[in-house]
């Protein structure tokens, strides 16, 4: 119930017209990055919105060509209590905070004269991890999650698509892949044996 208004606002976000037109055609990448960091996002990256990863049911809904990839850190202490209700609160609580911050960032992008469509973390439109890899924010780990050099897998992800003039970031090899090949902790400890020992296919 608490996240419903955030999800509903995200669904219509792409239809909202900017209150002004862009003052110039200059690149606004760093303006958006600084604003996002100021709001509290720990990771911010820019890349092409790759429609290959969009769910079929959302392909007509997704409007804009650029993806702003955003990650919000999840509380470390609470996360270490998994499995517990405390850890669940950390998980969903971070999504709730992220949803509200996304609305603020979208509002800022519109104030620059551009459209912004929120791909709500509570209403995913596709697979986000490949775009986060392309934006240089991490790599796919053996656990099937995005591993960031700053947060590990302890981050919640969302994307805002836009038509703003931005410059794309580049993929970075953080060495996560090689580390996963030798670590194997998640593979060996997975209760359901759902993870494989073989090399993980990856991009970036």
What spans do the regions from the language model cover?
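Iron-sulfur (Fe-S) cluster-binding modules
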Residues: 1-46
């Amino acid at each position: 119930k608490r996240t419903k208004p955030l999800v509903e606002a995200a669904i219509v976000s792409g239809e909202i017209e900017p209150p002004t037109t862009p003052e110039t055609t200059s690149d606004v990448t760093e303006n958006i990055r600084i604003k996002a960091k100021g709001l509290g996002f720990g990771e911010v990256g820019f890349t092409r919105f790759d429609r290959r990863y969009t769910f079929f049911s959302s392909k007509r809904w997704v409007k804009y060509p650029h993806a702003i990839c955003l990650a919000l850190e999840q509380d470390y202490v609470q996360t270490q209590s998994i499995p517990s209700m405390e850890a669940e609160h950390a998980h969903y609580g971070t999504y709730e905070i992220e949803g509200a911050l996304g609305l603020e960032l979208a509002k800022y992008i519109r104030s620059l004269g551009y459209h912004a469509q929120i791909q709500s973390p509570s209403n995913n439109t596709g697979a986000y991890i490949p775009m986060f890899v392309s934006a240089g924010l991490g790599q796919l780990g053996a656990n099937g999650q995005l591993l960031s050099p700053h947060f590990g897998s302890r981050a919640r992800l969302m994307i805002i698509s836009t038509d703003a003039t931005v410059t794309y970031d580049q993929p970075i090899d953080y060495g996560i892949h090689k580390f996963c090949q030798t670590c194997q902790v998640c593979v060996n400890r997975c209760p359901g044996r759902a993870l494989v020992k073989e090399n993980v296919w990856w991009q970036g």
